[in-house]
């Protein structure tokens, strides 16, 4: 996971360098250290998301009951805002995996580098290349097939983390416009 960086999806050198700088100052090394510790502990992959919450010292508080509000079988699409980046995915996967193991999250391809959760991720490639477009079409097909088989798909419909338009002003972060993919996927598969 040494190559774990979102900069690899950017095509120009300035963007790659900028992303690497932001990653450095926003805790990437700490996350890498925590992940390396996790690997040494030889924990069960089924508990990865719960273990990640513990390692990050996050206390997840919800206003619903997992076992009552998440169906134990049948296809389901979980649609969520993406306000906090990695924390959103870790939290949602922890909630879902406490009830079921037949789930996958549609997310950035770089996150598949974590071996413990590789099979839980349907990768999206944001590079915009011809190969990326073909891979993303395959990702959509994989999500459809998984839902038709009765699984759960977790999706962040804006496809991006909420951001501030001006980091120097006291504005709230805004979620990007939601893409139509989640709605189309629901209609195409009759998922809940």
How does the language model describe each region?
Residues 56-192:
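Soluble catalytic domains of membrane acyltransferases
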Residues 1-79, 89-91, 100:
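Membrane-anchoring hydrophobic helices of lipid-metabolizing enzymes
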């Amino acid at each position: 996971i040494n190559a774990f960086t979102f900069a690899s999806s950017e095509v120009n050198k300035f963007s790659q360098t900028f992303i690497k700088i932001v990653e450095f100052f926003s805790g990437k090394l700490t996350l890498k250290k925590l992940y390396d510790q996790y690997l040494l502990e030889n924990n069960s992959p089924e508990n990865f998301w719960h273990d990640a919450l513990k390692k990050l010292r996050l206390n997840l508080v919800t206003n619903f009951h997992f076992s009552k509000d998440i169906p134990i079988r049948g296809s389901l699409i979980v649609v969520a805002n993406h306000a906090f980046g990695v924390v959103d995915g870790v939290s949602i996967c922890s909630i879902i995996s406490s009830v079921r193991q037949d789930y996958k999250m549609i997310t950035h391809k770089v996150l598949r580098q974590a071996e413990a959760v590789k099979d839980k991720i349907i990768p999206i490639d944001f590079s915009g290349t011809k190969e990326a477009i073909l891979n993303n079409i395959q990702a959509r097909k994989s999500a459809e097939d998984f839902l038709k088989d009765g699984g759960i798909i977790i999706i962040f419909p804006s496809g991006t983390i909420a951001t501030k338009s001006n980091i120097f002003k006291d504005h709230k972060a805004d979620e990007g416009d939601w893409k139509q993919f989640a709605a189309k996927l629901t209609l195409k598969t009759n998922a809940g």
